[in-house]
């Protein structure tokens, strides 16, 4: 096998069109085109998302290849997100990958979006030394659609040992932010306001779920009932207390996440712990990871902010590991909206 492997990654699972190029584990480019159109609707509109992907995919891929400083003929394989995600959005990336694969005569690599988030911890930028978790390690994957504790034995062997049984942590942030009138996406807004508030100002329900599983529906309901009762007494309650509400909400979510992760790490005698997914951009959660590193002797790994949300660099490095295994996919591969780790 040649020494350097160049992989083009394509990500189109939701509302971000992204393309990236990696040489082995080193990122050469990572281009992302977002879709501001969804803010007016308070959430992602699937039809609008797929149309925007069709408009963005060609210029985004072209720009990624240009920034990487390579010719398209140097690409060894194309990695694309097969799922989970919005089917219409996934179809755009999958179809483009097929066309480019046929035109260049190179293989395709189908990537699980959740695997890719985990493997974002293995990305490095030019000039950086490789610093990534040793196997086995635990990864807390938190996003708008997923809250999972994953036991990672290798890039090809991952097991979900705990997951949400209802709402995801990111979904709880978004929905609670929406009822406060804070806008979409709610997670970053809650994070910003939380830094200005008192995390002990309000107490919300904490679930009692067996094992390492999570539940956030009770917390969400408790939050809504608190607002209902307080607004009945004072119509300006949210405006007067939004920083404290956000701080208390964020503190509760993080406490729920970390309690289960602590138990999983203890039970599996693991000290290598990673964070991944869109909610990993939350500064409070990052601080909690560093605090646990000091208190419990963990070695923690947290992706740079650029690799926390959906991006093609994580797809490309996931594809790189598949390339090493010779795990190529047929040209008739189809995307799936729902697949697990």
UniProtKB/Swiss-Prot annotation:
Catalytic reaction annotation: L-threonylcarbamoyladenylate + adenosine(37) in tRNA = N(6)-L-threonylcarbamoyladenosine(37) in tRNA + AMP + H(+)
Record bears the keyword Cytoplasm: yes
Chain positions recorded as Fe cation binding sites: 113, 117, 310
Enzyme class: transferase
Protein localization: Cytoplasm
Gene Ontology cellular-component annotations: cytoplasm
HAMAP family (alphabetical): TsaD (MF_01445)
Any Pfam family hit: TsaD
CDD domains in the record: ASKHA_NBD_TsaD_bac
Name of this chain's protein: tRNA N6-adenosine threonylcarbamoyltransferase
Function description: Required for the formation of a threonylcarbamoyl group on adenosine at position 37 (t(6)A37) in tRNAs that read codons beginning with adenine. Is involved in the transfer of the threonylcarbamoyl moiety of threonylcarbamoyl-AMP (TC-AMP) to the N6 group of A37, together with TsaE and TsaB. TsaD likely plays a direct catalytic role in this reaction.
Annotated keywords: Acyltransferase, Cytoplasm, Iron, Metal-binding, Transferase, tRNA processing
Phylogenetic classification of the source organism: Bacteria, Pseudomonadati, Bacteroidota, Bacteroidia, Bacteroidales
Positions annotated to bind substrate: 141-145, 174, 187, 282
Keyword set includes Aminoacyl-tRNA synthetase: no
NCBIfam families: gcp_kae1, T6A_TsaD_YgjD
GO BP annotation list: tRNA threonylcarbamoyladenosine modification
GO molecular function, one term: N(6)-L-threonylcarbamoyladenine synthase activity
EC number of the protein: 2.3.1.234
Cofactor(s) needed by this chain: Fe(2+)
